[in-house]
């Protein structure tokens, strides 16, 4: 196990005390809001640090007592009984704190932009893209998050050729960021008379929703085109005369939106563009840091096949962590927490391993 970063722990305690003092002094409302946000972020970490420090002190006291021959035998026997318990508590606390003290992803608390595109497999791929969107929509509903479709292009037989949506809530990106990649489906299409299993795929991209403070977009770097657009109808698609296409000239990124008004379109297209540019920046930074990355989880490679959904066997396999679950029906209803948590645990384990190598 990697050693706990003692200096970092002391710095967090010092900062926490400083925030408490500043909040007690009655600062201006905007300053108080920022301090309160940092306070709530630090509180669980500092609370755990204090519990750990108390346990370490208790262990030292017990060991001193055991070595002191002037202490009566009964007291030493009690100390000997308590010792394994305290050691076990310290070990458990160290494991918890390793996770709490891992470097934080600045985007983890953000909302997210979800993009799903049908890949190989024609109309069956579009149907699968629709199934994936509903899966994430139900997961979001269970979490109390808000889902809003920004644009959608329906498949001829249903589903979506492409669908882009915002998922708004605290910590959405942290939960869904490992969903990016190629999702493959194996099933018998309804139109398949011979009962043969077909394989098709859809690509998922989960981007942290960027705010204006995160990324600057200069007016001279974008071209805005307005055009007539009509969607294919359906629950999530609006028919409009005011579709907007925004091209970011330096990167070549193109975003379209077809809401009911040009103002809404421009705002939503800019929202997606900002998030794509922010994500591209994060990807560049990650690739510079990832030369020694051991974990396939979190590699950010969206061309990588990450998961297979085998309908005849009711099986879902995540290839990055070799996890297979026979609960496909429940997962398609939005019960993806088990996979999400397993991916996060694997990623954290790889971070801990790297920290251990660095020390």
From Swiss-Prot:
Its main location: cytoplasm. It is found in: Cytoplasm. InterPro entries: PCRF, Pep_chain_release_fac_I, Pep_chain_release_fac_I_sf, Prokaryotic/Mito_RF, RF-1. The modification N5-methylglutamine is found at residue 235. Coiled coil: none annotated. One of its GO terms (molecular function) is translation release factor activity, codon specific. The keyword Phosphoprotein does not apply. One of its GO terms (cellular component) is cytoplasm. Pfam families: PCRF (PF03462), RF-1 (PF00472). Methylated by PrmC. Methylation increases the termination efficiency of RF1. The keyword Protein biosynthesis applies. Residues 280-306 are annotated as: Disordered. Keywords: Cytoplasm, Methylation, Protein biosynthesis. Peptide chain release factor 1 directs the termination of translation in response to the peptide chain termination codons UAG and UAA. Belongs to the prokaryotic/mitochondrial release factor family. This is Peptide chain release factor 1. The gene is prfA.
């Amino acid at each position: 196990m990697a050693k706990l970063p003692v200096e970092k722990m002391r710095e967090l305690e010092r900062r926490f005390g400083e925030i408490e003092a500043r909040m007690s002094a009655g600062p201006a409302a905007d300053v108080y809001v920022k301090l309160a946000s940092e306070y709530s972020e630090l509180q669980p970490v500092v609370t755990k640090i204090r519990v750990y420090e108390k346990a370490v002190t208790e262990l030292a006291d017990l060991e001193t007592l055991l070595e002191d021959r002037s202490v009566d035998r009964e007291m030493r026997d009690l100390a000997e009984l308590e010792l394994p318990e305290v050691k076990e508590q310290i070990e458990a606390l160290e494991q918890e704190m390793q996770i709490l003290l891992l470097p934080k992803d600045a985007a983890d608390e953000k909302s997210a932009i979800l993009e799903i595109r049908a890949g190989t497999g024609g109309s069956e791929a579009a149907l699968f893209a629709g199934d994936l969107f509903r899966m994430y929509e139900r997961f979001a509903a269970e979490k109390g998050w808000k889902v809003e479709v920004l644009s959608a292009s329906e498949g001829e037989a249903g589903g979506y050729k492409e669908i882009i949506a915002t998922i708004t809530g605290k910590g959405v990106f942290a939960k869904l960021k490992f969903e990016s990649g190629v999702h493959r489906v194996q099933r018998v299409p309804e139109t398949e008379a011979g009962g043969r299993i077909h394989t098709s795929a859809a690509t998922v991209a989960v981007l942290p929703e960027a705010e204006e403070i995160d990324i600057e977009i200069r007016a001279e770097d974008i071209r805005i085109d307005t055009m007539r657009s009509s969607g294919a109808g359906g629950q999530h698609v609006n028919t409009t005369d005011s579709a907007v296409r925004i091209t970011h000239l330096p990167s070549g990124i193109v975003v379209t939106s077809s809401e009911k008004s040009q103002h809404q379109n421009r705002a939503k297209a800019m929202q997606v563009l900002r998030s794509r540019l922010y994500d591209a920046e994060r990807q560049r930074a990650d690739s510079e840091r990832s030369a020694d990355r051991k974990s396939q989880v979190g590699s950010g490679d969206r061309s990588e096949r990450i998961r297979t959904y085998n309908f005849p066997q009711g099986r879902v396999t995540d290839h990055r962590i070799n996890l297979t679950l026979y609960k496909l029906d429940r997962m398609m209803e939005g019960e993806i927490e088990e996979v999400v948590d397993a991916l996060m645990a694997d990623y954290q384990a790889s971070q801990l391993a790297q920290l251990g190598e660095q020390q």
